[in-house]
């Protein structure tokens, strides 16, 4: 379940245990039952290869960029669309057959994406590749189930990883990109 963060709309995205991804537009105008006055509009964004239970729905830089993860064995667990769900790309790459619980894209470098799995945190710096290369990013954390990933933008984009039974860990994206570039000469200071 996720709501696209737009103050002028109320679009709700719902993932089911059966692998369906539903979009509810005008969700704030929904009324229960078979009410003809309900203005909520339901549509399916379910991909043809969606099998298993949806564990997370996240957005990229706009509402058309959607990341969906599944937490089952023996299936593809990471899907991405940049066209609002008209078509989906599988992004498991070299990831072992492990359930994926959550996903988070670096807002400063869209190529860098991290996932929370049954065996800790994994990352890629080439998400747009047809077969992204995933690497472990545990940084002192054991092979523990990650239940959620969150980003605190006001704290230099600090990432928090909630675990099953071992508390919460925090770190930063591993991007090589600097947050800020400063240059100066004798007469001026430039910040990019």
What are these regions (language model features)?
Residues 181-191:
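Short, solvent-exposed loop/edge segments of extracellular or virion-exposed proteins
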Residues 1-182:
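Extracellular glycan-interacting surfaces
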């Amino acid at each position: 379940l996720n709501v696209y963060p737009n103050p002028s709309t109320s679009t709700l995205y719902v993932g089911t245990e059966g692998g369906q991804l539903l979009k509810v537009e005008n969700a704030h105008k929904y009324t229960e039952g078979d009410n003809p006055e309900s203005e909520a509009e339901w549509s399916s964004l379910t991909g043809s290869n969606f099998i298993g239970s949806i564990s997370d729905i996240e957005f990229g830089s706009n509402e058309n960029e959607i990341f969906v993860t599944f937490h089952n064995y023996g299936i593809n667990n990471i899907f991405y669309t940049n066209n609002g769900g008209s078509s989906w790309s599988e992004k498991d790459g070299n990831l072992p057959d492990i359930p994926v619980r959550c996903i988070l894209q670096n807002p400063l470098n869209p190529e860098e994406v991290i996932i929370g799995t049954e065996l800790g945190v994994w990352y890629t710096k080439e998400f747009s590749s047809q077969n992204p290369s995933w690497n472990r990013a545990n940084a002192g954390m054991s092979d523990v189930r990650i239940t959620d990933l969150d980003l605190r933008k006001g704290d230099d984009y600090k990432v928090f990883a909630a675990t099953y039974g071992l508390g919460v860990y925090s770190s930063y994206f591993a991007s090589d990109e600097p947050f800020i570039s400063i240059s100066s000469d004798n007469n001026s200071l430039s910040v990019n």
